[in-house]
Regions:
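Conserved flavin/dinucleotide-binding core of flavoenzymes
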Residues: 16, 24, 259, 331-460
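Active-site/ligand-binding neighborhood in enzyme catalytic cores
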Residues: 135-249, 256, 289
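Dinucleotide-binding Rossmann-like beta1-alpha1 core, especially the glycine-rich loop
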Residues: 51-140
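Central helical "cap/lid" subdomain
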Residues: 254-255, 262-321
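Charged, often glycine-rich, active-site loop that binds/positions anionic groups
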Residues: 94-104, 251, 256-260, 264, ...
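N-terminal Rossmann-like FAD-binding beta1-loop-alpha1 element of flavoenzymes
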Residues: 3-32
Length: 460
């Protein structure tokens, strides 16, 4: 059988694309091939004996318009739940001392005056007393220094050519503004690492201003984000011309005589389609010969690992868990971020890491298993909080080798994103996913946005 559309990837980008194709053209024949034994990709709500937690994507914010629209369409909008964006920095040099962070606060007012509205590009020297006063008013004297340091870098960037910022990392650019000690402090206290060293400065600054800004309200979905996947799947399978196959790892894509032939590993069966839509990360696409002409564009996106470690802790003699009252933390050891989830059930995200820190945890887990993870967690949590830490009842490690994509140094993200959507005009080959989003990379919104653009190209 020849399908009108073959979609490679059963994550949210692939399912959302199929959903919109069928909305506009209900009789279209569609085949979705997913390499795992389940749909969802990096949206995965883990449900086990000890906890129900987000193994992959976790939160979204008020600017994620397409996601809000989708949640309403799927009848999930009543489950949207506000979460506090506030966080504190816990330096290991002073265990138990927590410093506030403006970058995660919601109630500090607008910072737009720092970006626009002045009618000119203000100098760092001019703005320093203004935003220093602003930070003191918002946070008092215990504000975390990295907020001021990061904003000094952002302000300094406003007078720089875009091409310069695209060709250096955030920390490389920061060297022109800050001292080595200040840069080291940012690297230690800013929870995310890849944004500082992997992303080009232009896109990293955009991410900080638009997605990590304290003005955004953040949310989670009660019951888990996997409900989005389940709802989309249930709507898709109602159409008689769609087929969804899991455990189908694509080995090769061939194009000849205006049609695509898809070969899967360990299967003699091939699949034929008129349109091929690839909703998979760059690392997958780079293996296919058909994408070699645009490999130089795919190389502009650097996929880096993420690792979430959740633990359930026992209650003490007083009936409370050790992390009672603990705020969300960033810290300058291998934990990087610590996020309490449910004090009543004793659930905490004991570590959330990216880049080299995520790899280190995964290597430890592969070598020493859960006991090794627990030993390391107890040591680092005590180092960070100054509290006595009991042995966890259970810990789960969720490691993603390609957690999210980053626009790398040298990338013109606007151009590359546009080019990769329909990379070779002579064939009906398309790409979508958060990885390829110009302005919403690293968010579910990016998957939906690139899918929407693809649908527009198809002109259904």
């Amino acid at each position: 059988m020849k399908y009108e559309y073959i979609i490679l990837g059963g994550g949210v980008a692939g399912l959302y694309t199929a959903y919109h194709i069928l909305q506009k053209s209900p009789n279209s024949s569609i085949l979705i091939l997913e390499k795992e034994n389940h749909l969802g990709g990096r949206i995965h709500t883990f449900s086990g004996k000890h906890m129900i937690v987000e193994a992959g994507a976790g939160r979204f914010h008020e600017k994620n318009i397409l996601l809000f629209e989708l949640l309403k369409e799927l009848g999930l909008d009543s489950k949207i739940d506000k979460i506090s964006g506030s966080a504190s920095f816990a330096p290991i040099e002073n265990p138990g001392v927590f410093m506030n962070s403006i970058l995660d606060r919601e109630d500090v007012g607008s910072l737009d005056f720092l970006r626009s509205g002045m009618g000119f590009s203000p100098s760092v020297d001019f703005l320093t007393p203004i935003y220093k006063l602003f930070f003191d008013m918002a946070l008092g004297k215990q504000n975390i220094p990295n907020a001021e340091l990061i904003f000094r870098v952002i302000i300094a960037s406003k007078g720089e050519p875009l091409t310069k910022l695209q060709n250096i990392s955030f920390l490389q650019f920061a060297k022109e503004v800050l001292t080595k000690e200040e840069i080291d402090f940012i690297a230690g206290s800013f929870g995310y690492y890849s944004e500082l060293v992997i992303m080009n400065a232009a896109d990293a600054i955009y991410l900080m201003e638009q997605h990590l800004t304290p003005m955004n309200q953040f949310y989670v979905l009660k019951g888990g984000l996997s409900q989005i996947i389940e709802k989309l799947e249930s709507k898709l399978v109602k159409h008689k011309h769609i087929k969804i196959l899991t455990n189908r790892a694509v080995k090769q894509i061939h194009f000849s005589k205006n049609e695509f032939t898809i070969h899967c590993e360990n299967l003699e069966t091939t699949y034929i389609g008129e349109n091929c839509i690839c909703a998979a990360p760059t690392g997958v696409l780079q293996k296919f010969r058909i994408f070699h002409p645009v490999k130089y564009l795919l190389n502009k996106i650097d996929c880096q690992p993420l690792c979430r470690i959740y633990s359930q802790f026992p209650k003490g003699d007083d009936g409370a868990v050790w992390f009672t009252g603990l705020p969300k933390l960033t810290t300058n050891n291998d934990l990087r971020m610590v996020i309490p989830i449910d004090e009543k059930e004793g659930i905490i995200m004991s570590s959330y890491t990216d880049n080299k820190f995520a790899r280190k945890w995964n290597q430890l887990f592969e070598k020493e298993g859960e006991p090794g993870i627990n030993r390391r967690l107890i040591s680092l949590l005590k180092e960070t909080t100054g509290r006595d830490i009991p042995l966890p009842v259970k810990s789960y490690v969720f490691y993603w080798d390609c957690g999210v994509g980053y626009w790398s140094v040298g990338a013109n993200s606007a151009m590359v994103s546009e080019r990769l959507l329909h990379p070779m005009k002579e064939m009906k080959l398309f790409i979508c996913g958060e990885t390829y989003s110009y302005q919403n990379q690293q968010w579910i919104e990016g998957a939906l946005e690139t899918s929407k653009k693809l649908i527009d190209i198809l002109s259904l």
